[in-house]
Curated annotation (Swiss-Prot):
Annotated catalysed reactions: L-citrulline + L-aspartate + ATP = 2-(N(omega)-L-arginino)succinate + AMP + diphosphate + H(+)
Localization in the cell: Cytoplasm
The protein, known as: Argininosuccinate synthase
Organism of this sequence: Campylobacter lari (strain RM2100 / D67 / ATCC BAA-1060)
Residues reported in the UniProt entry to bind L-citrulline: Y91, S96, N127, R131, S181, S190, E266, Y278
A UniProt-annotated Pfam family: Arginosuc_syn_C
A GO term from the CC aspect: cytoplasm
Binding site for ATP: A11, Y12, S13, G14, G15, L16, D17, T18, S19, A38, G121
Disulfide bridge positions per record: none
Residue positions binding L-aspartate: T123, N127, D128
Length: 406
């Protein structure tokens, strides 16, 4: 197989691990390497990745750096939030939702450069290997996939560092680099490893990089207004912005008020339990607001059906099935439900809390004060409720007459 692979597209961050993979691919597969670096809002300068790739012998024309922030938010994050997707009741899927976009870009570059394979730096223990590879195989099943962590014998930090030194790969650590295994994008930051491998141990205070500690948040609450169009956020406090700008603004507001920290143990697709800590400030606000606007614009049974289907939808994303018939079927249903999810939601942010204090929809609200008022009304005949209750109780009445006990 190795001799058949002449060109490989590598998901490349410019960091130590993927730089070692780059050199390993050149040596082990004797392949030409194409690098792809995605800007999905991780907050790092990406041009150093270009310089690093050049220093490792990658041709200038084989270095791809793409700004995918708006595509990430518009086509992936917003699509997911239309479903109110949460995995196992808590996780907002910040890492999971980024992987299909990266897989798609890898395949597009492989097709453009006539590459034989793609490669990634995900380990053989985690979910990301599944997400990258399911996505790639769905989009181009003819591409080979190289996962070095499943092949090489560089199975310790010491061996990796020795390999880097042997091949002249810069191993100087950035002064601000976290010792934790981190993943960052415009939706979240995740932390794994070190003290977090003990589920009973409290995370170190200096681990968190984004959301303020509650003791450091303002002592005054802040009221904001979010506007939705067909289920997607379109404005904050009346200001229209691009999808990436909207999420960035929500992140700023949420982080300021201590919103979005999470410490959970989740069930990985590969079978093991894993502890992760997450910061999702903007997503936490967005979820609350989206459910609030749905509460006045969605039909009851449509809303309940969405809630029943959501865990399946969330699991599909978590497990890597973004490019699958079943996810696309669910997405079509979800998107159909959002046609009338238009309006504004007012929220109060304070000390880690997101409180809905108002919601309105000029043309799509199903909330009728005339029907639900506690005052006298002329539209609802309360006598009708007697027949409604009797028909719904009919099975209980029949069972009771037959001596059934509940």
């Amino acid at each position: 197989m190795k001799k058949d692979i002449k060109k490989v597209v590598l998901a490349y961050s410019g960091g130590l691990d993927t730089s070692i993979i780059l050199k390993w691919l050149q040596d082990e597969y004797k392949s030409e390497v194409v690098t792809f670096t995605a800007d999905i809002g991780q907050g790092e300068e990406l041009e150093p990745a270009r310089k690093k790739a050049l220093s490792l012998g990658v041709k200038e024309e084989n270095i791809f750096i793409k700004d995918l922030k708006d595509e990430f938010v518009k086509d992936y994050v917003f699509a997911m939030f239309r479903a109110n997707a949460i995995y196992e009741g808590e996780y907002l899927l910040g890492t999971s939702i980024a992987r299909p976009l990266i897989a798609k870009a890898l395949v597009e570059i492989a097709n453009k450069t006539n590459a034989d394979a793609i490669s990634h730096g995900a380990t053989g223990k985690g979910n990301d290997q599944v997400r990258f590879e399911l996505g790639a195989l769905a989009l181009n099943p003819n591409l080979a996939i190289i996962a070095p962590w499943r092949e090489w014998d560089l199975n310790s930090r010491e061996k990796l560092l020795a390999y880097a030194q042997k091949h002249g790969i810069d191993i100087v650590k950035k002064a601000d680099k976290s010792p934790y295994s981190m993943d960052a994008n415009l939706l979240h930051i995740s932390y794994e490893g070190l003290v977090l491998e003990d589920p009973a141990a409290k995370p170190e205070a200096d681990m968190w990089r984004w959301v303020r500690d509650l003791k450091q948040t303002p002592n005054e609450s802040e009221v904001i207004e979010l506007e939705f169009s067909k289920g997607d956020l379109c404005a904050i406090n009346g200001e229209k912005m691009s999808p990436a700008q909207l999420l960035a603004k929500l992140n700023e507001l949420g982080a300021k008020h201590g919103i979005g920290r999470l410490d959970i143990v989740e069930n990985r697709y590969v079978g093991m339990k894993s502890r992760g800590c997450y910061e999702t400030p903007g997503g936490s606000i967005l979820l609350k607001a989206h459910r609030a606007i749905e509460s006045i614009t969605l039909d009851r049974e449509a809303a309940h059906l969405k809630d029943e289907l959501m865990p399946k939808y969330a699991s599909l994303i978590y497990n890597g099935y973004w490019f699958s018939p079943e996810r696309l079927m669910l997405q079509a249903l979800i998107d159909e439900s959002q046609k009338h999810v238009n309006g504004k939601v007012k929220l109060e942010l304070y000390k880690g809390n997101v409180m809905v204090i108002g919601r309105e929809s000029a043309n799509d609200s199903l909330f009728s004060e005339a029907y639900c008022t506690f005052e006298e009304d002329s539209v609802y005949d309360q006598k009708d409720a007697a027949g409604f209750i009797k028909l719904n109780a009919l099975r209980f009445i029949i069972a009771g007459k037959n001596g059934r006990k509940f």
